[in-house]
Amino acid sequence: MRALTLLLLGALGFGANSGNMNIFRSLATLAYDCRRPDFFREELMGAVRIVERGDLKPHEMIGNWAGELGPTQFTPSQYFKYGVDFDGDGRVDMIHSTPDALASAANLMKSFGWQRGQPWLQEVRVPAEMPWQESGLENKHPRSQWVRWGVTAARGQLPADNLEASLILPMGRLGPAFLAYPNFKAYIEWNAALVYSTTAAYFGTRLAGAPPFGQGNGQPV
């Protein structure tokens, strides 16, 4: 939950940039004048369902230009499907209730495949003779294979087991290297930008007690 907290709040300046637009107007405009009218028509109906269910009043339906709501920036359909009434007041209120917002974010991450207790990002050391074509999120191998290729954990040992991971190099071969585990996919599903997802995942590891990652040393080791 601590990792999710930063992912949620850091995405929008800790809730400072949630938007100030009436999402009914935003979604109605996008449903009429957009390259994805079917998508936004469904989101407009999702916004109506939120009000019908009693979660928010029409004047509280404030978000960004794309119709995303509150500090979590959920689409209305996500809000309706994954919203959680964590504070027990009888309605899902991600606008005013921090417990509801955080629990809903965790619920959405779970839908993206998040597995509690499993790793998401681990700093590693990569040998110079590494088959670099195997790096990238599109390539997944068991940790045992990464170990055979000479990849080692930056701290501790890298188990030679069957847990799949991808090698990502955010700053290229000469920068820090990481194994991204299946839980990292949940960050990518939330925001497909690798820089954003890696940063959020990194701060998540820091909140979980991990030391700072290295900055690279100018050459593979």
Positions of predicted regions on the chain:
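Acidic/histidine-rich, surface-exposed loop or edge segments in extracytoplasmic proteins
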Residues: 181
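Catalytic glycan-binding domains that act on GlcNAc-containing polysaccharides
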Residues: 1-164, 175-178, 188-214
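Solvent-exposed beta-strand motifs enriched in subsets of small alpha/beta binding domains
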Residues: 215-221
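Alpha-helical and coiled-coil interaction segments, frequently adjacent to or embedded
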Residues: 168-170
